[in-house]
Amino acid sequence: MERAIFAGGCFWCMVQPFEELDGIVSVRSGYTGGHVPNPSYEQVCSKTTGHTEAVEIIFDPQKIDYSDLVELYWQQTDPTDAFGQFEDRGDNYRPVIFYFDERQKEIAEQSRENLQLSGRFQDPIVTQIEEAQPFYLAEDYHQAFYRKNPERYAQSSKQRHDFLEENWH
């Protein structure tokens, strides 16, 4: 099994698209990239930990390639917004692809370059590609939030949904 970590705004909205793919073992919400060990949601929201909300994906590389996950990642985000995603603002919502090895780094960088050259977006692609840091699981109530709270999930993801429909579908 291999790991991938993606940050694309509120982690609630990043779980379902990946969970639905064949070859995915698990998708868990959490925090990474900061300097405070085992942060709470409240600490991360205070913007004092350096962490960003992210999802950790465990996948079977015999069934799905990392490059496929990166392509799906782009389609869940606004890669031109470095200061958060949609209605979620601040460093704790910044878009980042975290890599575990040189292969993942190269795939992510090439994919970002291809997206920039595609002309899909007029603004520069600003999503960061950074070395993976320790990943801390979010509290249980955040896990699989879209299944536990479908109405709240739909409300919180409307702006994202509208952007994705307009720019990716």
UniProtKB/Swiss-Prot annotation:
Keyword Oxidoreductase set for record: yes
Active site as annotated: C10
Gene3D superfamilies attached to this UniProt entry: Peptide methionine sulphoxide reductase MsrA
One of the GO biological process terms: protein modification process
InterPro entries from the UniProt entry: Met_Sox_Rdtase_MsrA_dom (IPR002569), Met_Sox_Rdtase_MsrA_sf (IPR036509)
Keywords from the named record: Oxidoreductase
Keyword Oxidoreductase belongs to the record: yes
Recorded catalytic activity of this chain's protein: L-methionyl-[protein] + [thioredoxin]-disulfide + H2O = L-methionyl-(S)-S-oxide-[protein] + [thioredoxin]-dithiol; [thioredoxin]-disulfide + L-methionine + H2O = L-methionine (S)-S-oxide + [thioredoxin]-dithiol
EC number in record: 1.8.4.11
GO molecular function: L-methionine:thioredoxin-disulfide S-oxidoreductase activity; peptide-methionine (S)-S-oxide reductase activity
Family that this chain belongs to: Belongs to the MsrA Met sulfoxide reductase family.
Stated role: Has an important function as a repair enzyme for proteins that have been inactivated by oxidation. Catalyzes the reversible oxidation-reduction of methionine sulfoxide in proteins to methionine.
Protein name: Peptide methionine sulfoxide reductase MsrA
Gene symbol of the encoding locus: msrA
